[in-house]
């Protein structure tokens, strides 16, 4: 009989390495008075938890742990809430297992 092993996403993410390009984030959130529904959704659906709602009700991004999966582009590209570009060569996520 095999024993099921529960794996957490946090354990997998911990294996990745990130080379941060200090002062040049590849993701920025457009200034807003109140966040759109898509920006609010990013606080829940970003797999790396890069988006947070701050104390003033604004959505902020911390791009340091970004997996470059494109979830934010899919949700916010149409309305322009997020500006996303690829990190410069050699920077960004370095996947441990491919």
UniProtKB/Swiss-Prot annotation:
Residue ranges of domain 4Fe-4S ferredoxin-type in the record: 57-87
One example GO MF annotation: iron-sulfur cluster binding
Keywords, comma-separated and alphabetical: Electron transport, Iron, Iron-sulfur, Metal-binding, Nitrogen fixation, Plasmid, Transport
Residue runs in coiled coils: none
Superkingdom of origin organism: Bacteria
PROSITE patterns: 4FE4S_FER_1, 4FE4S_FER_2
InterPro entries associated with the record: 4Fe4S_Fe-S-bd, 4Fe4S_Fe_S_CS, ETF-QO/FixX_C, Fd_FixX
Signal peptide: none
GO biological process: nitrogen fixation
Described function: Could be a 3Fe-4S cluster-containing protein.
Family in the record: To ferredoxins from P.putida and C.tartarivorum, ferredoxin I from A.vinelandii, ferredoxin II from D.desulfuricans.
UniProt xrefs under PANTHER family: FERREDOXIN-LIKE (PTHR43082), FERREDOXIN-LIKE PROTEIN YDIT (PTHR43082:SF3)
Protein name (database record): Ferredoxin-like protein
Organism: Rhizobium meliloti (strain 1021)
Taxonomic lineage of the native organism: Bacteria, Pseudomonadati, Pseudomonadota, Alphaproteobacteria, Hyphomicrobiales
Gene: fixX
